[in-house]
């Protein structure tokens, strides 16, 4: 399960960071884990063990709100596995980490069986991990996939860029957030091809102030065809704004906040296979 760098605990305890910018938002950590090549192992055995691991530990961890476990597709190396974990606060994330040992005891109350499982499952993993990011999840614009499924899905990770407010003529944070909320409600929530979506902004990762501000969108699709579809929102947009003039006016207003000059507005970070049986939704 996810381990958070102990530095996070130090920061919380010393009071350097007191919380998210918006107390209604959540904290999301992104970490990378590395698989071992097991001579007498198999993918079948690995996934059987992993399903037991995550099913039991996700259930035991009351602080963990959601978890995506993302395998290789078109990003990185075959042995790299990314976990995107959500908590209500960084304090909850720390409690989750501190309590892992007790959770494992509850999940496998028989000590011998627990040790045997840990040994068998643990050989598939290297002992190291890399903490990639700690971000603020905009909870007012989250779309969750609550449907029961055993079929793996596809997850894209894309970084977008906001203009400094000083460069947006007549712009305000209130207006920007209202426009983003409207797009989420009318497009993202109505588009069945977008299974889930998370918008994450600066917390301890990325830039803030002095220029363009990046934010990250994590989107889940049923298949690679939908993930690759450039105009996946076109039909929903047409239905939500049937009047062409009103449609143009809305996007002209919204898009003035997006920095199109920086990497043409976005940068594709990753495309993963989402191992749905390991997720906590």
Where are the regions that the model predicts?
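Sec-dependent N-terminal signal peptides
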Residues: 4-16
């Amino acid at each position: 399960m996810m381990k958070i760098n102990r530095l996070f605990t130090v920061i919380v305890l010393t009071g350097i960071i007191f919380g998210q910018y918006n107390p209604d938002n959540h904290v999301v950590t992104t970490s990378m884990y590395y698989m071992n090549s097991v001579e007498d192992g198999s993918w079948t055995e690995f996934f059987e063990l992993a399903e037991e691991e995550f099913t039991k530990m996700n259930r035991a961890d009351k602080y963990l709100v959601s978890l995506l476990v993302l395998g290789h597709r078109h990003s990185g190396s075959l042995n790299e596995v990314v976990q995107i974990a959500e908590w209500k606060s960084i304090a909850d994330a720390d409690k989750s980490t501190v309590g892992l040992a007790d959770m494992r005891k509850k999940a496998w109350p028989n000590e011998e069986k627990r040790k045997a499982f840990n040994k068998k499952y643990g050989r598939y993993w290297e002992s190291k991990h890399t903490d990639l990011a700690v971000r603020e999840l905009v909870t007012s614009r989250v779309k969750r996939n609550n449907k029961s499924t055993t079929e793996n899905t596809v997850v894209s990770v894309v970084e977008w860029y906001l203009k400094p407010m000083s460069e947006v003529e007549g712009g305000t944070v209130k207006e920007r957030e209202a426009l983003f909320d409207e797009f989420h409600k009318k497009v993202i929530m109505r588009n069945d091809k977008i299974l889930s979506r998370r918008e994450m902004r600066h917390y301890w990762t990325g830039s803030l102030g002095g220029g363009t501000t990046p934010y990250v969108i994590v989107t889940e699709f049923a298949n690679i065809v939908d993930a690759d579809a450039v105009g996946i929102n076109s039909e929903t947009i047409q239905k939500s704004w049937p009047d062409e003039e009103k449609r143009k006016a809305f996007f002209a207003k919204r898009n003035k906040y997006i920095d199109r000059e920086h990497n043409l507005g976005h940068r594709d970070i990753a495309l993963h296979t989402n191992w749905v049986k390991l997720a906590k939704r």
